[in-house]
Amino acid sequence: MTDYGALVISPGLVDIHVHLNEPGREEWEGFETGTKAAAAGGVTTVVDMPLNSYPTICDAATFDGKLAASEGKLHVDVAFWGGLVPQNAHNESVLDELIERGVVGLKTFMSPSGIGDFEQSFKPDLEAALKTLGKHQVPLMAHAELPSDVDLDPNADPRKYATYLATRPRKWEQVRTLRDAHLLVFSARRSLASALVDDDDS
């Protein structure tokens, strides 16, 4: 037996929510630095998000560009999410090609993503795309926020965490329409409990 002191020995970790922003925004985080950092932390597989690179990964051509940008730069195993936006949600052949290229699923936002070329999706977009996702048996990963009227304090200090939390109230997560999906970035414990309930309203 070998004593490794304070070191931890474990299987390689998997991180399914990583932003490797090549091509287009390498200064944020690229394949080289992102996958080296993952390896240094014991993460042996990452799944890259379809936004923050430019262009965003919403069709076969942009996915091919992403793969080309990654050549020779990967230090761990990398898989990819494709993007679901209003521009491709109703085009079955575009989604077919993207999924058949090898993305592990599709990622969408139901609130503004903060990236201009990755627009938020709405209920008709999701309903159209879910048929294609079901056909291919791949998941939808959604920022499942449904914005409602929020009264924000114009004098709140933008540097405080409480000010940020006020922009994402619990009720945004509690109003929901559930399908087979990964729901991202829960911050309200009650919302998670609600999402796990299988009732007539889900």
Predicted regions and their residues:
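Active-site loop-to-helix "anion-binding N-cap" substructures in soluble metabolic enzymes
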Residues: M49-H75, L84-N88, V94-E97, T108-I115, ...
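Alpha-helix-loop-beta-strand connector modules within alpha/beta enzyme cores
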Residues: S10, D59-D77, D125-A142
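Active-site mouth loops of central-metabolism enzymes
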Residues: I16-E29, N52, I57, V76-H90, ...
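Short coil/turn connectors at secondary-structure junctions
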Residues: Y4-G5, I9, V43-T44, K73-D77, ...
